[in-house]
Structures are given as structure tokens and as C-alpha cells.
Amino acid sequence: MGGGVSVELPKRDPPPGVPTDEMLLNVDKMHDVIAPAKLLEYVHIGPLTKDKEDKVKKRYPEFRLVNTGPGGLSALLRQSYNGTAPNCCRTFNRTHYWKKDGKISDKYEEGAVLESCWPDVHDTGKCDVDLFDWCQGDTFDMNICHQWIGSAFNRSDRTVEGRQSLINLYNKMQRLCSKDASVPICELFLHHLRAHNTEDSKEMIDYILRQQSADFKQKYMRCSYPTRDKLEESLKYAEPRECWDPECSNANVNFLLTRNYNNLGLCNIVRCNTSVNNLQMDKTSSLRLSCGLSNSDRFSTVPVNRAKVVQHNIKHSFDLKLHLISLLSLLVIWILIVAI
């Protein structure tokens, strides 16, 4: 019997491991990647050592640290948004910020802590309490308040909390503005109520304006509350008083009652200049100004030159390709014959 043959193979060290993409991640270079993460979204941050874990937890308190694999592979899971109303609501461009020693910055710096703003924070009514107070102060931004009040009429939040916040805002605005509608935030509110253009918004406008003081009405609402003489004068004209009364044409439209605002929109205003050097009139005199727009001037009675009109239309029409049209006609006839 023959014996077996053994062969000794040369020994080799196994090839070095190739790191995966996750292993190459560096959490210290991922500030702008982690911050925008949505609620319950995972962000893989690569391997972490034990001492590094504590720093990451402190830097990102809105996230929970999760182990994803061997070698300390980890991920962050967003659980909350810790941004405050003053830091998130008084701008429409901020999604998050970094806080250190009581100061905030849009850029990360060593030792700073992330605080994120709730998505669509203005659309959910989470800013109503803060902005209602801030927009009455001395440091408010008119553009921010303008956009906030305008967006309140078009919110997509249909939750019970969102609806209640909107009702509370309307009630507070109504109480505030009924006392003095000249407050900037109230004038903005009236403007957006007018733009909303519903029966409810019109009723709220009139309710607020009718609650104003006598001094306010005398100063801002002389169109809506005219004198007896002005009312008697208006009986002489067929057109609405709002069309010729300077108190209406020069009024702040935010302080017009709905009926006056609507009448003002019906006016056809024609402006003309009249120069009079010397005019003497008595009780029997009569003066009428037409600005050169008599009935005979409005429509021309001169016959239209029809031949010239036809020539103009032919000249400016597209060039007819008669030979091309003939060829296309023959082609269509041939196709119809073949098809039959």
C-alpha cells in the first residue's frame, strides 16, 4: 500500500480589513448634517470611544445615542426640539442654533449645545404667544410681524391644539385692537382681515372699528363718520360720496368701514387740471367741469376706413405658402385614397 502525500502550503497573513463608509464617519465634522435631522430620524455618526460618548450626548441633548454595530459604531436618534420661542419665532429663516454661555450662534463652536426649532413653527401656532407680545414692543421687526399675522389666515395645522391657538389669537387681537386700532400690530391685523375677504372677517373689521374712541374716529375715520353738512352735500350727487369726498380718497383704507371701502372701489376717478384766473359767480351762476370728456368725445362718429384696415391686416398677417398648401392637400387626398 502506498503512503499519503502531504504538502505544506506557505503561510500568509490575512489582508487588512477595509473600513466601511460608516466606519469613516467623524462626528466632529457632522454638525451641519446632524442638526437638520427630523423627529425620529437616525443619523449615523461612526465609531465612538467611551469618553467621546459623553461629549456627544452633551452637544446633542435632543438626540438619543444608539449603538449600531461593533467597534463603537453609533447613531443619533432625534427625540425632541428644544429651541425657545424668542430664538425661533422672531425670524423665518432659522431652523436651529448653537448656544454657549447664554449666547446663540448659527455656526457651531467648541463647547456649544444644539437647540433646534420645531418644523413649521409659525404654521402650528407655537409662536402666537411670543409674537403677540413682541410685536407690540419697541424692538419688533415689522416684516416678521407682517408675515406672521398674514400666515395665521392660511395655516395648514388642523389639529385641536392648532385651531385653539388660532381662536385665542383672534380673541386677543380683537380685544387689543378694539381699544386702539392705530397700534401697528392692529393695523396689520386689519389689513390681513381685509385681504382675507370673508363675511366673518368683514364683520370683525367693522366691530373693531366701531369700538374706537371718539378721538380716533375724528382723526382717522372721518370718511366713515362724516359731518351732517357732508351728508347733506352728498344728496346733490349721483355717485357715492366716497368718490369725491377728500376724507375718503385720502383716508387710511385700514380704518374704513366695509361699506365705505366697497364704495371706494366702485369709483371711476378722472384727474384733470383746471386753471381759473378770475371767476365771479352769484346765486344764479352754474359751473360744470367735464375734463374734455363730453359724450360726443367719448366715441368717434367718423367712419372707419375699411380698405386701410384690411390692407393693414394683410400686411401684418403670416405669409401664405400657396404651393406648399397645394402639395399638402394632394398628400392628404392620396392618404385618404390609400386608406380606403
Swiss-Prot record:
Domain of life of the organism encoding this protein? Viruses
Q: Name one GO cellular component term.
A: membrane
Q: Where is this region: Disordered?
A: 1-20
Q: Which InterPro entries match?
A: Pox_virus_G9/A16
Q: Where is the lipid attached (N-myristoyl glycine)?
A: 2
Membrane association type: Single-pass type II membrane protein
How is the quaternary structure described? Interacts with OPG143. Component of the entry fusion complex (EFC) composed of OPG053, OPG076, OPG086, OPG094, OPG095, OPG099, OPG107, OPG143, OPG104, OPG147 and OPG155. Except for OPG095 and OPG053, each of the EFC proteins is required for assembly or stability of the complex.
Tell me which family the UniProt entry assigns to this protein. Answer: Belongs to the orthopoxvirus OPG086 family.
In Swiss-Prot or TrEMBL terms, this protein is called Entry-fusion complex protein OPG094
Organism, scientific name: Monkeypox virus
